[in-house]
Amino acid sequence: MANNKLAVIGGSGLYDVEEFTKREFLKIDTPWGKPSDEILKTNYNNKEVFFLPRHGRGHFISPSKINFKANIDALKQSGVTDIVSVSAVGSLKADLPPGKFVIIDQFIDRTFARNKTFFEDEIVAHVSMAHPTSNGLMDACEESIKKEKIDYQRGGTYVVMEGPQFSTLAESNLYRSWNADVIGMTNMPEAKLAREAEIRYASVSMVTDYDCWHPEHENVDVQQVIKVLLGNAAKAKNMIKNLIDNFEKHIDPKDPTNNCLDVAIITAPEKRTQKTKDKLKTVAGRVLKK
């Protein structure tokens, strides 16, 4: 399993860990443009790990403007096989209070201004998103969270909204009527693109607020989100260190993500131009070179 490499996508503070002493910042170009920022390559307990701040260092990229395709392509170029997303979310349920972690297993994609596929020009593919997260990585996340005695829930549906504005009360109540658990702005199309690139994906969401539906709590604002995130910072960093140590032992060699493109590409071989195959070399080269 020596070829498995973990990347964490999240806030820039997540890699501010004392033990990460050997650091290299990678500038990577992709056919889709530049990723959100330089990718940090570091080592922990002799294991290589990568960190990418999806909003850029200093949080200057709006959710709708994140270059998700470049981020995923750049991580794949770096040899990444597994991605764990760490993000702030609002709670849509009373039993998911601020401070609780949720290991996501489903998404409802409500975004509308983002490019959501690598396969949009001459080569068409339809990957399955029935189960958008990888069970093995979820197991690794759960073990890492338990070790820190963090209050958490395994399994939950994440509504991904376009943003950058927060929800209206009507929207928040609509999502609650769908029995969704949390709401945020960042995990789509990230999870879809990771699947298209055959990278295993898991999502750990940190609840920071009750959105705007709860009659006994203030409506969400940025200062409230930051306050809870800072309170969770030490726990999140320790969780990540645990993940680096344990994720490989949970990898499922039969994970459907590993070879999902084998049954996804529908375009006839004679219609696949070399120009497009070259563009997709990183994310789909395994199947397109056959």
Where are these regions (language model features)?
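His/Asp/Glu-rich mid-to-C-terminal helical/loop segments that flank catalytic regions of hydrolases
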Residues: 212-259
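Acidic, Ser/Thr-rich low-complexity intrinsically disordered segments
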Residues: 261-290
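Active-site/ligand-binding-proximal alpha/beta "capping" segment
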Residues: 147-181
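Zn-dependent metallopeptidase/amidohydrolase metal-coordination segment
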Residues: 185-223
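Short acidic/polar active-site loop segments enriched in Thr and Asp
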Residues: 81-82, 181, 200
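Generic non-transmembrane alpha-helical segments
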Residues: 136, 140-151, 238-246
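Metabolite-binding pocket within alpha/beta catalytic cores that recognizes anionic/polar moieties
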Residues: 1-131, 287-290
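Non-catalytic positions within long, well-ordered alpha-helices that form the structural scaffold/packing
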Residues: 76-79, 176, 195
